[in-house]
C-alpha cells in the first residue's frame, strides 16, 4: 500500500552533493568554507555545560536575533532564526503561498526550490536567465506574467556566482506583485569594494525577504543555522504562526551568536577565498576553461573541447569530473541543460586548489 500524497509520489527529491567518509578526499563540491570557524565559536562550544541541554532553548533565539539586529542596523523584529536556510525556504512557502499557486524561480538555480514547491503542491514557473546568467530587462514582467505570488532569486547566483547589483534588485522588487526572496547564502564572499548591501531593500520595501546563512561564510555548514531579514509583515507570521516550536537548538544558538559577534574573524577567511578565487580563475582560463565572473566561493567553469574522440564538451566535462573523482578530488557536475559542459568548483585552500589545477591539466593532456 502506498500512503504518499499523489504529488509526493510524482516528485523527485533533492539530490545532495557527495559527502565522502574516507579521509584524504579534497572536497570541492558543496561550497563549504575551507577554513575553520573562529576561535570564539570554539570557545563558546567548550564553555557549554551538559546542564545547558536539560531545558528547551529560547523559542525565538532572541540572543542571536539581537546580535543580528546590531550587525545589520535593524530592529530585532526584522529577524527570524531558522534551522538552516532550507527551513526558512519552507517557512516562506508555507506562510505566503496557497497550494496550487505558482512559485517562480530563476533557471538554473538552487535545485531545492522546485522540490519544496512540489512538496507544498505548488506550480513551478521557471524563468530562464540570459546566456550571461543575468535576469534580463523583462525579468519582472515575466515573473508577473507567471502569476507567481513568490519568487526566489539567489544572489550571488548559484551556480554561476554572478552578482546582481542592488539597483536591479530594487527595480525587480518594485515591479513584482509578490514576495521576493533574495537568497544571499554566498554574499559574504562578495568583493567589499563593490559595497553591495541588499539589506537596504528591507528598509525600503515590504515584499523583500533576505536569506542569510552561517553555513558558508562562517564555516558552520554542519551546524545548520540561518536567518531571515525582512519587513515585520513578513517576519511576524513566520515567527509566531508557522515556525516549528523550538526550531533552533541550544548549541546552535550559542555558537551562531558567537560566530556573528566575531564577524571580523570570519571576514579573514572571506578575503582568503577571494584571493584564491582570482588565482584559480586565472589558472583555469590559461588551461582553456571559461569561468563565469564569480562573487561567490565557487567558479562555474566551461571545459575546453577535447579531441575527436569526444563528441561534445558535455562528455568532456563529465570525463573531467570522473577523472578528478578517481584521483580523490570532488567537484560538482550537473547533468542538466546549460550546465552539462561545465564544472562547479568550490574554492578550497591554496594547496587543495593547486592539486585541482594539476589534475585538470593532466586530464586535458590525456584528452
What are these regions (language model features)?
Residues 29, 230, 300-308, 325-364:
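Conserved PLP-binding active-site segment of the aspartate aminotransferase-like
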Amino acid at each position: 500500500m502506498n500512503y504518499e500524497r499523489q504529488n509526493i509520489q510524482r516528485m523527485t527529491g533533492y539530490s545532495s552533493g557527495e559527502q565522502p567518509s574516507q579521509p584524504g578526499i579534497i572536497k570541492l563540491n558543496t561550497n563549504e568554507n575551507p577554513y575553520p570557524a573562529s576561535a570564539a565559536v570554539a570557545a563558546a562550544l567548550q564553555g557549554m555545560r551538559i546542564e545547558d541541554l536539560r531545558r528547551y532553548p529560547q523559542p525565538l533565539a532572541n540572543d542571536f536575533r539581537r546580535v543580528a539586529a546590531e550587525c545589520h542596523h535593524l530592529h530585532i523584529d526584522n529577524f527570524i532564526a531558522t534551522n538552516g536556510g532550507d527551513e526558512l525556504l519552507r517557512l516562506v512557502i508555507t506562510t505566503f503561498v496557497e497550494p496550487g499557486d505558482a512559485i517562480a524561480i530563476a533557471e538554473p538555480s538552487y535545485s531545492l526550490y522546485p522540490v519544496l514547491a512540489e512538496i507544498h503542491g505548488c506550480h513551478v514557473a521557471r524563468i530562464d536567465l540570459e546566456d550571461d546568467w543575468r535576469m534580463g530587462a523583462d525579468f519582472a514582467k515575466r515573473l508577473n506574467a507567471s502569476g507567481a505570488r513568490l519568487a526566489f532569486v539567489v544572489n550571488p547566483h548559484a551556480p554561476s556566482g554572478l552578482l546582481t547589483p542592488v539597483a536591479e534588485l530594487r527595480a525587480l522588487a518594485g515591479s513584482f506583485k509578490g514576495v521576493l526572496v533574495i537568497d544571499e547564502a554566498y554574499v559574504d564572499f562578495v568583493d567589499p569594494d563593490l559595497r553591495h548591501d541588499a539589506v537596504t531593500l528591507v528598509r525600503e520595501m515590504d515584499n523583500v525577504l533576505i536569506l542569510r546563512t552561517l553555513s558558508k561564510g562562517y564555516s558552520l555548514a554542519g551546524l545548520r543555522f540561518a536567518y531571515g531579514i525582512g519587513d515585520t509583515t513578513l517576519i511576524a507570521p513566520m515567527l509566531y504562526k508557522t515556525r516549528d516550536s523550538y526550531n533552533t537548538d541550544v548549541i546552535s544558538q550559542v555558537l551562531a551568536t558567537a560566530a556573528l559577534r566575531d564577524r571580523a574573524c570570519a571576514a579573514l577567511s572571506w578575503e582568503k577565498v577571494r584571493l584564491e578565487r582570482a588565482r584559480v580563475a586565472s589558472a583555469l582560463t590559461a588551461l582553456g576553461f571559461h569561468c563565469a565572473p564569480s562573487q561567490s566561493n565557487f567558479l562555474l567553469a566551461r571545459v575546453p573541447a577535447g579531441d575527436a574522440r569526444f563528441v561534445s564538451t558535455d562528455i568532456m566535462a563529465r570525463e573531467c569530473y570522473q577523472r578528478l573523482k578517481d584521483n580523490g578530488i570532488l567537484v560538482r557536475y550537473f547533468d542538466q541543460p546549460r550546465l552539462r559542459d561545465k564544472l562547479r568548483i568550490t574554492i578550497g585552500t591554496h594547496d587543495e586548489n593547486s592539486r585541482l589545477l594539476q589534475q585538470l591539466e593532466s586530464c586535458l593532456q590525456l584528452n
